[in-house]
Amino acid sequence: MRRSLSMPTSPTPVSSECTQQQGSLPAPTPRGRLVVLTGPSGVGKGTLVNQLRQRHPELYLSVSVTTRPPRPSEQEGVNYYFRSREEFLNLIEANELLEWAQYAGNFYGTPREIVFQKLNQGQDVLLEIELAGARQVRQQYPDAIRIFLCPPSLEELERRIRERGQDSEASIERRLEQARKELDAQDEFDYVIVNDNLEQALQELEALLYPPSPSSKEQQP
C-alpha cells in the first residue's frame, strides 16, 4: 500500500503520470533503516540527495560500484567505486553485491558488506538506485523503505534531460522510453514524491524520514 507525505504547505499539482501518496515513517530504531530512492534518469535524484545530506550528514549514502569510466569530476570511493567488467562479475559471483543491474551498457551495483555494517551500527542507509536494483533489494530486504521520485510530467523530464546537454538524440529517446516503464512501476513503492519544485520535494522527503518529535511540535508557537 502506497503512502505519501502530509505537508503543511499546499500540495504540488500531480501529473497524470504520478499519484502522490501520503503518510509518515516511524522514528529510527536501534538498527538503522534502509531507504531506497528510485526514479527516472533526469528526475533530480542526485540533487535531492545532496541537499538532504547537507541537512542530515548522519545519513549514509551508499557508494555504488560501476564499470562506467569515471567522469572528470568524479572521485574513486566518493562518487563510485570504478571497476573493470571482470572485477564486477567477480563481485556478483562472490555474492558481494546487495543488488546489481545493467544500464546503458554499464554495470552498477551496491556493495553488501558496508550497507549491513552501517545498519547494524544503527545508522540509516540511503540507496540511490535504478528500478531493477530496487526490485532486488525488496526481495532481499523487505523492510526497506521504498520511495519513488516522479517528474511532474514526461515533457518536463525531457526538458531537464536536454538541458543537461550530455546525451545524444538516440540516448534521450532511450531514457524517455525507460522512464515510461519506470513510471508504470510506481505502484510497487511505499511512497511517491513529485519533484516539481526542489525545495518542496526536499521538505517532503525530510518530513518522511525525519518527522518532528511530539515535544518539538509542542514547543512551536
Swiss-Prot record:
GO terms for cellular component: cytosol. PROSITE patterns: GUANYLATE_KINASE_1 (PS00856), GUANYLATE_KINASE_2 (PS50052). Keywords: ATP-binding, Cytoplasm, Kinase, Nucleotide-binding, Transferase. Residues 1-32 are annotated as: Disordered. Residues 32-210 form the Guanylate kinase-like domain. It is found in: Cytoplasm. NCBIfam families: guanyl_kin. Essential for recycling GMP and indirectly, cGMP. This is Guanylate kinase. It comes from Synechococcus sp. (strain JA-2-3B'a(2-13)) (Cyanobacteria bacterium Yellowstone B-Prime).
